[in-house]
Amino acid sequence: MHKRTFDLLLLVPTAPVFFPLLGGLALLVWAVDGRPVFFSQPRAKKHGATFSILKLRTMTCDDDVEARVPTRLGRWLRHHGLDELPQLLQVWQGHMSLVGPRPLKPDDVERLAQAHPAFRERLQVAPGLTGLAQITQVTGAQRTAEVDAHYARRHSRSMDMRILLRTVWVVLTGFGAR
């Protein structure tokens, strides 16, 4: 079974829960923090192609990037990983997978790959909504590069299921979140 098929087999039956939840959270962001509701930014995907990642907006919209601060809902959304929920649409579209290395900005991939060559291996698989580096709580670019490279070389459906189950646990309990 291909990874894309695996993603869709998990996404389709959960869509009646996740998509109304996404709609409700979008309405909540709009009601509490105003517009825009979503934030998008270019990210690198498989083989270095780019796409625009979509998140619920969690920061103020100040023109000065340095002056931006979390919105009233932003801290809570981020803590529970709910700002990432719009990326389920990008899994649906095939830009992302449920599990894989988290997508980085293209210039960050290039900069980090020069310092840590293992970072290039992450581009051999689709970026994910969650990943091995996230559930193992690694810190530092070198260690993240190693964990992402390990995932790119050895990923399997059983590994993806373990990562997804651990992610659900973190989202529901807040335990183990970084």
PLM feature segments, named:
Residues 1-60, 162-178:
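A hydrophobic, helix-centered structural microdomain
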Residues 2, 18, 67, 78-82, ...:
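Short, solvent-exposed loop/helix junctions and linker helices
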Residues 8, 121-178:
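C-terminal terminal-structure detector
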Residues 25, 39-40, 99-101, 107, ...:
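Short, hydrophobic secondary-structure boundary micro-motifs
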Residues 30-31, 79, 91, 138:
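Conserved catalytic core of Hanks-type protein kinase domains
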Residues 36-76, 129-147:
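Short, glycine-rich, amphipathic interfacial segments at transmembrane boundaries or analogous
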Residues 67-126, 164:
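A short, structured surface patch at a secondary-structure boundary
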